[in-house]
Amino acid sequence: MYAIIETGGKQIKVEAGQEIYVEKLAGEVGDVVTFDKVLFVGGDSAKVGVPFVDGATVTAKVEKQGRAKKLTVYKYKPKKNYHKKQGHRQPYTKLTIDAINA
């Protein structure tokens, strides 16, 4: 059985036992997170939500809070002596999917 959930403005296909990386969620390591925005549940009998499947939830456990590798943003304007260098590290949350309840 699998499901498609919405979190952080993105849609992610998940299965039980899978590890996923999502946009930063509030919670400490070991906390349980429940996703109510389930768009689709697949398996023996598929359920399509309009826009969400009624009564369907996905539970996951927070494994890690972290930050991605650094991205360097460099801007400049030619012939004007304007240079700007800036770094960015996107925060993320690593989850392990425990169960899909449909």
UniProtKB/Swiss-Prot annotation:
<dbReference type="GO" id="GO:0006412">
    <property type="term" value="P:translation"/>
</dbReference>
<comment type="similarity">
    <text>Belongs to the bacterial ribosomal protein bL21 family.</text>
</comment>
<keyword id="KW-0694">RNA-binding</keyword>
<dbReference type="Pfam" id="PF00829">
    <property type="entry name" value="Ribosomal_L21p"/>
</dbReference>
<dbReference type="InterPro" id="IPR001787">
    <property type="entry name" value="Ribosomal_bL21"/>
</dbReference>
<dbReference type="GO" id="GO:0005840">
    <property type="term" value="C:ribosome"/>
</dbReference>
<dbReference type="InterPro" id="IPR036164">
    <property type="entry name" value="bL21-like_sf"/>
</dbReference>
<comment type="function">
    <text>This protein binds to 23S rRNA in the presence of protein L20.</text>
</comment>
<dbReference type="InterPro" id="IPR018258">
    <property type="entry name" value="Ribosomal_bL21_CS"/>
</dbReference>
<comment type="subunit">
    <text>Part of the 50S ribosomal subunit. Contacts protein L20.</text>
</comment>
<dbReference type="GO" id="GO:0019843">
    <property type="term" value="F:rRNA binding"/>
</dbReference>
<dbReference type="GO" id="GO:0005737">
    <property type="term" value="C:cytoplasm"/>
</dbReference>
<keyword id="KW-0689">Ribosomal protein</keyword>
<dbReference type="InterPro" id="IPR028909">
    <property type="entry name" value="bL21-like"/>
</dbReference>
<keyword id="KW-0699">rRNA-binding</keyword>
<protein>
    <recommendedName>
        <fullName>Large ribosomal subunit protein bL21</fullName>
    </recommendedName>
</protein>
<dbReference type="GO" id="GO:0003735">
    <property type="term" value="F:structural constituent of ribosome"/>
</dbReference>
<dbReference type="GO" id="GO:1990904">
    <property type="term" value="C:ribonucleoprotein complex"/>
</dbReference>
<keyword id="KW-0687">Ribonucleoprotein</keyword>
